[in-house]
Amino acid sequence: MTVPYFYKNSNSRFLSIEGEDSNEFLQNLITNDINQCSKDNFLYSCLLTPQGKFLSDFFIFKEDEKYLLETHSFFYEKLLKKLNLYKLRSKVNIKEVYNLHSYSVFGDLQKDQDTLIFNIDPR
């Protein structure tokens, strides 16, 4: 067994999307099937322009009744602006989240369901 090494992804930023329309809202915007997202399985997805050009990529985590999106700080403001633009009359709340951190792990790690959310990066 190898000792795990943690690297803090200091360029990661988070936002949350919650509300009764959050599932449908994300399903209509992103490049992955939001229904595959669960507490134990995060998704890697993208937001594209109406012409199909890349705007942002992110990971999506499901936590209770809300979704957490993690993206690079370079794309964060653009992503937040576009999601708020597309919100229209959807019953969703989009909020910035400041108390979360992202880490890359190298080596073996035992999964503790209560304290860690992790999966293999599909990129």
Cite the ranges covered by each PLM segment:
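Basic, glycine/lysine-rich polyanion-binding surfaces/domains
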Residues: 1-123
